[in-house]
């Protein structure tokens, strides 16, 4: 059975794994999921990620990060969904928690944070909010 929203599935797997304090979470891999994991690692929300191939299927393993026994990611919310895409121009890019959080945006230059998109002067599809 095909999945209608693999990005929402990825975010839900991360939320569920952190709720039970797992050290890592494994999911099917795709280029977009790897790009999201790279942004999360660059921003310090996850420890590490790795793509492994087994039996012709690629898997993405994400190492979760905790601080003082609590998950580093407090909020992980999907914004643009398959049924309702959310696009923002370069002057409309949202701030998450007044700049404390990050919005991950898909732009013509690739996936990037809201701060980088504002600095570059590009808009795009708002994938998710992370705080």
Swiss-Prot record:
InterPro entries recorded for this chain? Ribosomal_uS8 (IPR000630), Ribosomal_uS8_CS (IPR047863), Ribosomal_uS8_sf (IPR035987)
UniProt keyword annotation of Signal present = no
* Gene Ontology cellular component terms for the protein in this record: ribonucleoprotein complex; ribosome
Under Pfam families, the record lists: Ribosomal_S8 (PF00410)
Question: Which keywords does this Swiss-Prot/TrEMBL entry list?
Answer: Ribonucleoprotein, Ribosomal protein, RNA-binding, rRNA-binding
A GO MF annotation of the entry reads: rRNA binding
Name one process (GO BP) from the record: translation
What role does it play? One of the primary rRNA binding proteins, it binds directly to 16S rRNA central domain where it helps coordinate assembly of the platform of the 30S subunit.
Record's family? Belongs to the universal ribosomal protein uS8 family.
Q: How does it assemble?
A: Part of the 30S ribosomal subunit. Contacts proteins S5 and S12.
From the Swiss-Prot or TrEMBL record, give the protein name. Small ribosomal subunit protein uS8
Q: Which organism is it from?
A: Ralstonia nicotianae (strain ATCC BAA-1114 / GMI1000)
The taxonomy runs: Bacteria, Pseudomonadati, Pseudomonadota, Betaproteobacteria, Burkholderiales
Q: Which gene encodes it?
A: rpsH
């Amino acid at each position: 059975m095909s999945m209608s929203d693999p990005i929402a599935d990825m975010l839900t797997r991360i939320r569920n794994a952190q709720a039970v304090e797992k050290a890592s979470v494994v999911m099917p891999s795709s280029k977009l999921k790897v790009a999201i994991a790279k942004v999360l690692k660059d921003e310090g929300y996850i420890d590490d990620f790795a793509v492994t191939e087994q039996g012709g299927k690629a898997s993405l393993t994400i190492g979760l990060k905790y601080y003082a026994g609590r998950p580093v990611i407090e909020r992980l919310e999907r914004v643009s969904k398959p049924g309702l895409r959310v696009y923002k121009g370069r002057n409309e890019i949202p701030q998450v928690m007044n700049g404390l959080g990050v919005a991950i945006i898909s732009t013509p230059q690739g996936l990037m944070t809201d701060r980088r998109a504002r600095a570059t002067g590009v808009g795009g599809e708002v994938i998710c909010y992370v705080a």
